[in-house]
Amino acid sequence: MTHPLQLGFQDATSPIMEELLHFHDHTLMIVFLISSLVLYIITLMLTTKLTHTSTMDAQEVETVWTILPAIILILIALPSLRILYMMDEINNPLLTVKTMGHQWYWSYEYTDYEDLNFDSYMVPTTDLKPGELRLLEVDNRVVLPMEVPIRMLISSEDVLHSWAVPSLGLKTDAIPGRLNQTTLTSTRPGLYYGQCSEICGSNHSFMPIVLELVPLKYFEDWSVSMT
């Protein structure tokens, strides 16, 4: 969950986000080790009493600093490609939801149901109830079942938007005339907040996304009440 003055990532709520957090830690450790080594070498170069330190010519050293970066890049690229393919793979989704971006709200359509669609607008600050989040609450939440694969189809009716929910590791561009897709699977129930992450006009900051992940039985009851 998120909290005020948070500096790190939100807690992972999907297998993809857990993989992304592990990859971030893996890459950050490599960057930290490289930075420490470079700073150590610079310090030695500045403090050594030896002369002609800038005219060294050693074939072995040049070979090492050519091969070593290639190995490091491979160690970063392989897990990155694995996650990339995992994010692109969608196997037998239980539910498909079509999302359309507008200036400046989202509309949703549950394509597996005959007449289940709605628009989702931000709740103005003056209408917020105690405990609700400013600029993040909507009048119609996207209710989805947890622990099942869900396919999101994302597009736009006017300008570029981006449908992003950080705790689920989701960020997909909404492009006019193009239908993008992504998959989500939540491992726990709750409310998950996101926002449009592509500058789309004067009210870009007022396009929140709220997903309400519930057990399958509650989702079925909700879908019946909405149709």
UniProtKB/Swiss-Prot annotation:
GO terms for cellular component: mitochondrial inner membrane; respiratory chain complex IV. It is found in: Mitochondrion inner membrane. One of its GO terms (biological process) is ATP synthesis coupled electron transport. It catalyses: 4 Fe(II)-[cytochrome c] + O2 + 8 H(+)(in) = 4 Fe(III)-[cytochrome c] + 2 H2O + 4 H(+)(out). InterPro entries: CcO_II (IPR045187), CcO_II-like_C (IPR002429), CcO_II_C (IPR034210), Copper_CuA (IPR001505), Cupredoxin (IPR008972), Cyt_c_oxidase_su2 (IPR014222), Cyt_c_oxidase_su2_TM_dom (IPR011759), Cyt_c_oxidase_su2_TM_sf (IPR036257). Its main location: mitochondrion. The modification Phosphotyrosine is found at Y218. PROSITE patterns: COX2 (PS00078), COX2_CUA (PS50857), COX2_TM (PS50999). It comes from the Eukaryota. Gene3D superfamilies: 1.10.287.90, Cupredoxins - blue copper proteins (2.60.40.420). Cu cation A2 binds at C196, E198, C200, H204. Residues 46-59 are mitochondrial matrix. Disulfide bonds: none annotated. Cu cation A1 binds at H161, C196, C200, M207. Its EC number is 7.1.1.9. Component of the cytochrome c oxidase (complex IV, CIV), a multisubunit enzyme composed of 14 subunits. The complex is composed of a catalytic core of 3 subunits MT-CO1, MT-CO2 and MT-CO3, encoded in the mitochondrial DNA, and 11 supernumerary subunits COX4I, COX5A, COX5B, COX6A, COX6B, COX6C, COX7A, COX7B, COX7C, COX8 and NDUFA4, which are encoded in the nuclear genome. Belongs to the cytochrome c oxidase subunit 2 family. This is Cytochrome c oxidase subunit 2. The gene is MT-CO2.
